[in-house]
Regions:
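Bacterial N-terminal signal peptides that target proteins for export
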Residues: 1-7, 308
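Conserved active-site regions of diverse hydrolases
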Residues: 20-308
Length: 340
């Protein structure tokens, strides 16, 4: 009887904190833009908020919505943190999410602070050595890509001009991400996830500008991502989260992800504001919280061991065998010899 209870308790302890404890993460630190901002801009820009309904697909919010974020509810970082048994509260409120809406990956403008500035602030608060068993997620580049798209639009049909903007944007973006990764690793980080750039060409705001803008937006993101993949290379401390491909997969087969509309901004429709669960986009570029859940699930599958791996680890651990004997608990190898 006691051995059965012990086995049940052991199984519960082993599998209950499946994502957090077995993955070994003690904290989640996030650096990013509006896709990741869990409330920093809401604090910094209060009491300004973006009202709904919004005018249409072209609308991109400057201020957070009533949720305090650039979406209808939680961002992916909060959803992921909850699943891992951690938290991702805004850094301005003492939390571990340093993301600010509108942030570029680098640059000298402090408002909003770039990802490089966010990482520097984090290191000044937690350095010189940071937790090696924490999870660090670097999400950025979408703002860089959008600025490049606007700038390239001013080139007209001048391909040299367009290519120059794409190349300079890409070089700056990759350099910024490499700087952040290098600084985190030098301080002790061992678990870093870097997002690539989302396919801005398929967002409602860019689609509203026509097919040429859409194709150019996709091209810009693709070039940036190819360079990022090459730069990250075989660094064992860094995992690449392919948000570009995930977005394409969702749009290609929305039903498989529980969605029905992947082209329109939900927040322009009163009915959708009340129930946004079937829409991919909340406004012209920002996903709904339903889409953020898809993102969170994908990241979790990247950073948490597969169930099969966990099962093998469990079997190996149990192979040593814990048994509760009449005189107490002892470790054994092989078959039990005492009474249950």
């Amino acid at each position: 009887m006691k051995s059965s209870v012990l086995a049940s308790v052991f199984a519960f302890v082993l599998f209950a904190p499946l994502s957090g404890a077995l993955a070994g993460y003690t904290s989640l630190f996030v650096f990013g833009d509006s896709l990741s901002d869990s409330g920093n801009n809401a604090v910094a820009l209060a009491p300004n908020v973006t009202p709904v309904p919004i005018p249409g697909n072209s609308f991109i919010a400057t201020f957070p919505y009533m949720s305090g974020r650039y979406t209808n509810a939680q961002v992916w970082a909060q959803i992921l943190a909850s699943s891992l048994g951690l938290s991702a509260n805004p850094s301005l409120l003492g939390g571990t999410d340093y993301a600010f809406g509108g942030a570029l990956t680098g640059g000298s403008n402090p408002i909003p602070p770039s990802l490089e500035m966010q990482a520097a602030l984090f290191l000044s608060q937690h350095g010189p050595m940071i937790p090696s068993n924490a999870l660090y997620i670097v999400e950025g580049g979408g703002e860089n890509a959008q600025q490049a798209l606007v700038a390239a639009g001013g080139c007209g049909s001048n391909l040299a001009c367009i290519n120059g903007i794409i190349q300079s944007t890409t070089a700056g973006y990759v350099g910024d991400i490499q700087t952040i990764d290098t600084e985190l690793e030098a301080a002790g980080a061992k678990n870093i996830v870097v997002w690539n750039v989302p396919n801005i060409g398929v967002t409602p705001a860019v689609l509203a500008e026509g097919s040429a803008a859409s194709m150019l937006g996709t091209t810009i993101a693709s070039v940036m991502n190819n360079a990022l993949s090459t730069a990250i290379g075989m660094d064992s401390d860094i995992k690449l989260f392919d948000d570009f491909s995930l977005l394409n997969q969702v749009i290609a087969d929305p039903g498989a992800f529980g969605l029905s509309n992947v082209t329109d901004a939900c927040a322009q429709f009163t009915a959708c504001i009340e129930d946004p669960s079937k829409f991919l986009f909340w406004d012209g570029v920002h996903p709904t919280s339903a889409a953020k859940t898809i993102i969170s699930d994908a990241i979790e599958s990247l950073v948490v061991p597969e169930p099969s791996t966990l099962a093998l680890l469990t079997a190996a651990f149990l192979g040593f065998g814990f048994v509760l004997c009449s005189g107490g608990t002892r470790l054994y190898s092989g078959r039990p010899t005492g009474p249950e």
